[in-house]
Swiss-Prot record:
Zn(2+) binds at residues 304, 307, 325, 328. PANTHER family: PEROXISOME ASSEMBLY PROTEIN 12, PEROXISOME ASSEMBLY PROTEIN 12 PEROXIN-12. A zinc finger (RING-type) spans 304-343. This is Peroxisome assembly protein 12. Pathway: Protein modification; protein ubiquitination. Residues 48-51, 140-144, 278-359 are cytoplasmic. Keywords: Membrane, Metal-binding, Peroxisome, Protein transport, Transmembrane, Transmembrane helix, Transport, Ubl conjugation pathway, Zinc, Zinc-finger. The three subunits of the retrotranslocation channel (PEX2, PEX10 and PEX12) coassemble in the membrane into a channel with an open 10 Angstrom pore. The RING-type zinc-fingers that catalyze PEX5 receptor ubiquitination are positioned above the pore on the cytosolic side of the complex. It is a multi-pass membrane protein. It comes from the Eukaryota. InterPro entries: PEX12, Pex_N, Znf_RING/FYVE/PHD.
Amino acid sequence: MAEHGAHITTASVVDDQPSIFEVVAQDSLMSAVRPALQHVVKVLAESNPAHFGFFWRWFDEIFTLLDLLLQQHYLSKTSASFSENFYGLKRIVMGDQHKLQRLANAGLPKQQFMKSIMFLVLLPYLKVKLEKLVSSLREEDEYSIHPPSSRWKRFYRAFLAAYPFVNMAWEGWFLVQQLRYILGKAQHHSPLLRLAGVRLGRLTVQDIQALEHKPAEASMMQLPAGSIGEKIKSALKKAVGGVALSLSTGLSVGVFFLQFLEWWYSSENQETIKSLTALPTPPPPVHLDYNSDSPLLPKMKTVCPLCRKNRVNDTVLATSGYVFCYRCVFHYVRSHQACPITGYPTEVQHLIKLYSPEN
């Protein structure tokens, strides 16, 4: 009875097909790495904007570049992405007969390799940028930055109205595919795998042995390059491989650390939280008025530090506590991603409008 239930749970179409729990776990792995790294970079940028502000402003591009190196390394060396290899899975080209399947260390054919790179690296980057664009447009629409009769405003309002339905259809497509995978009606838990022309399978004993012996064989079979171009190409390959290997090692350690943190915080009980929140409130910082005579600050407290006029639509920056006109600080933060006075990294969502009794 238990065996029958296990077979229903895995819903295997083929013998090496992983269970839904394995494929969902590997999907959630990289989606947890991005926000974790983003939080680390944000903390560093807030503590030292001069040195780490660049990494915060260009986080998406830097992360995508590192992700490209990492996924390229794993797809060419193990026929799997980093998260798939972490859970002992590999990508199998659709249409291959079971007897003719390639070992994992052979890598993917060029067509499937390029499609996999596109769906693993490029598509998530575009999705993140689209979500940020939608968030920015909603901010502008909420505070009416553009004139009501603007053609551009009518266009992006229509875009904002349609986006939730498009996003719901996209997520529903993935949900339906996962349900079909659970019921054994599909070999792919994700539509992107089908578009890439591959499916996921477990690593076999032969795959593991080939992956373990490949580094030793590669080091023994290295031949001296003939021309200068070949030497440069070989050096670049070694450099990229070294960076990818360092990233994979660091990510493996980081993943275990993230899992430890999840366990640590999930094990906290309510008594511990209450004891921490019951501690007395610390005194205010003594350095808040240190820069009160800064030339950037006007002497009149009702004057905006940017336009040097009486403030209109008072807005405070959550990152620094200074108050500006909404329009002034909105355009400044959107252009510079920093507080005009302190230089702290700041985003549009850090703007808080104030409503005084006089208004």
